[in-house]
From Swiss-Prot:
Disulfide topology: 39-61, 60-99, 67-92, 90-127, 132-144
EC code(s) of this entry: 3.1.1.4
Molecular function via GO: calcium channel regulator activity; metal ion binding; phospholipase A2 activity; toxin activity
GO-annotated biological processes: arachidonate secretion; lipid catabolic process; phospholipid metabolic process
Keyword presence, Membrane: no
Compartments it resides in: Secreted
UniProt name for this protein: Phospholipase A2 heteromtoxin
Subunit structure: Heterodimer composed of a large and a small subunits; disulfide-linked.
Family: Belongs to the phospholipase A2 family. Group III subfamily.
InterPro entries hit by this protein: PLipase_A2_dom, PLipase_A2_dom_sf, PLipase_A2_His_AS
Length: 167
């Protein structure tokens, strides 16, 4: 295919970075729930305190996004995430579910209920629990540097089908 010369324009590195960033942000915005900046597979927030129109719902998603997790294909706590989605700590999932249940409002309440239904019932990737071996806690911090994780298994139909198809 031949591109006419009048359709080609050189651009500076700064212009190119601007357009690349804009395209990236547009792609991320399309993957977030309307009225939020944190709910979805990406985020469009400009900072950690930037929330969308549904502030309470968005706050739940922001907290969840920063929670303990194992990205797809990575290993942590001796557990390898062989799925195609990020696996979350079960404590985080429990807090997220309750946070979504606590969101009220004429529009925001039903939006939070929809996010909860899609995330836990359809997506439902499962989660992992971390146990600390006897005597494994740090006396100084109380942390468990050698924790061992166990996976709960998928809880939603969508994750089960996708992981089976790709595994």
């Amino acid at each position: 295919m031949h591109t006419p010369k009048h359709a080609i324009r050189r651009m500076s590195k700064g212009e190119m970075e601007f357009f690349e960033g804009r395209c990236q942000r547009m792609g991320e915005a399309e993957r977030t729930v309307w009225g939020t900046k944190w709910c979805g597979s990406g985020n469009e927030a400009t900072s950690g305190i930037d929330l969308g129109y549904f502030k309470n719902l968005d706050s739940c998603c922001r907290t969840h996004d920063h929670c303990d997790n194992i990205p797809a294909g990575e290993t942590k706590y001796g557990l390898t995430n062989e799925g195609i989605y990020t696996m979350m700590n079960c404590k985080c999932e429990s807090v997220f579910k309750q946070c979504l249940k606590d969101v009220t409002g004429v529009f925001e309440g039903p939006a939070a209920a929809a996010v909860r239904k899609i995330y836990f019932d359809l997506y439902g990737n499962g989660c992992y629990s971390v146990q600390c071996p006897a005597g494994g806690r740090s006396a100084r911090t109380g942390g468990c540097p050698n924790g061992v994780a166990t996976y709960t298994g998928e809880t939603g139909y969508g994750a089960w089908l996708l992981n089976k198809a790709n595994g």
